[in-house]
């Protein structure tokens, strides 16, 4: 696996695919800088070697050229974070971009305009990828967030750098963290899967049953499993058409000696609202008119005990509707348990959408071993898929 450390970038132009797809407010100010901060170590290493950096990224889902999606909006923020002046060119291929790249001196940074202003980027167009490849000497992929897309800048471009392509530090760390959970992690291994729907996690569950010793299932998907086993779930979210599948998963887990832990009690509410009346109920005895919106106190205690005995932990998906304060306790408690286990030497990886948001919101970001930057890419890795952006560097 070729990484940044396999190259010396002195007098070289590094063409880096970063993931600067960051959220902007109405004034076009960056509201979450995580992805820019995550790219910093790669960029700084290249500059310190005596090289220059040409950064390419997408932003949002523009239809053609739309100013609101221009990467020039983020130039100042990128400069603040890197502590280096960032030049900007308002295209990513063609004479303008080539001239700007050619004029770049060692120690300098150039940010190209949004790749997705060209439809060829998402189409994985070979000629477009070749035009991009003219800008640099060494190709560095450091964008885990788009590694599951076979786009021009993430995958197709690598073929134009057969000997001069590598992973940046961020992508290397992502690959190593997933490998640790899925292959080399110290046992017992625990996966915590939450979120609303079983259907979105089926492939992950099937793939990880061979790799884990314990599986905690929480969040909305709980109720499909409970109802499938004959419990009453009231008005809780439930995928009736997935109940047979839930039973099949339970059967597979038993055959593979994986212990599945479901909530035993819930915080139930008489409406989907933070102001609703609530009560603690047995998870199998929720009356009509009530819905489970968070894990209850007994469940929290049970989950804590499971977490504390595990050495490798994957957390994907919250245990309740944490966006509402009254239904955040389960998710916060789980975060505390995982933080404590990590402090005691466990390896913990948090990844996939909502759990990342929860970890940030409740301040666990620096108390776990690693927080993944890729939503869809992380999920596809856990499903056992080879991501095109990663395969393109390994080939």
Name each region found by the language model:
Residues 1-395:
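Active-site loop-to-helix "anion-binding N-cap" substructures in soluble metabolic enzymes
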């Amino acid at each position: 696996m070729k990484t940044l450390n396999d190259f010396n970038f002195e007098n070289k132009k590094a063409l880096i695919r970063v993931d600067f797809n960051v959220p902007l407010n109405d004034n076009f100010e960056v509201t979450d800088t995580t992805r820019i901060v995550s790219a910093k170590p790669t960029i700084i290493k290249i500059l310190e070697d005596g090289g220059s950096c040409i950064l390419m990224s997408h932003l949002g889902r523009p239809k053609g050229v739309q100013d609101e999606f221009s990467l020039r909006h983020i130039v100042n923020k990128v400069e603040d974070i890197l502590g280096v002046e960032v030049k900007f060119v308002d295209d990513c291929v063609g004479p303008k971009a080539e001239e700007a790249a050619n004029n770049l001196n060692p120690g300098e940074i150039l940010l190209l305009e949004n790749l997705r202003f060209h439809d060829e980027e998402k189409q994985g167009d070979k000629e477009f990828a070749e035009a991009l490849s003219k800008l640099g000497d060494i190709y560095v992929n450091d964008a885990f967030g788009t590694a599951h897309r076979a786009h021009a800048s993430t995958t197709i471009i690598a073929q134009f750098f057969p000997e001069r392509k590598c992973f940046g530090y961020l992508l290397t760390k992502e690959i190593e963290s997933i490998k640790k959970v899925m292959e080399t992690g110290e046992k017992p291994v625990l996966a915590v899967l939450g979120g609303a729907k079983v259907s979105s996690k089926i492939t992950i569950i099937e793939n990880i049953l061979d790799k884990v010793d314990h599986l905690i299932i929480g969040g909305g998907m709980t109720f499909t499993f409970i109802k499938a086993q004959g419990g009453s779930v009231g008005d809780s979210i439930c995928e009736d058409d997935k109940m047979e599948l839930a039973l099949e998963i339970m059967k597979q887990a038993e055959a593979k000696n994986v212990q599945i832990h479901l909530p035993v009690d819930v915080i139930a509410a008489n409406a989907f609202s933070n102001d609703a009346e609530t009560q603690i109920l047995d998870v199998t005895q929720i009356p009509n008119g009530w819905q489970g919106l968070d894990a209850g106190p007994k469940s929290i205690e049970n989950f804590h005990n499971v977490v504390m005995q595990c050495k490798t932990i994957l957390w994907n998906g919250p245990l309740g509707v944490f966006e509402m304060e009254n239904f955040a306790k389960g998710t916060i408690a789980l975060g505390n348990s995982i933080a404590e286990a990590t402090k005691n030497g466990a390896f913990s990886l948090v990844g996939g959408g909502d759990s990342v948001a929860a970890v940030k919101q409740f301040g666990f970001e620096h108390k776990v071993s690693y927080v993944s930057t890729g939503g869809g890419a992380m999920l596809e890795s856990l499903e056992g898929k080879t991501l095109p952006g990663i395969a393109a560097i390994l080939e």
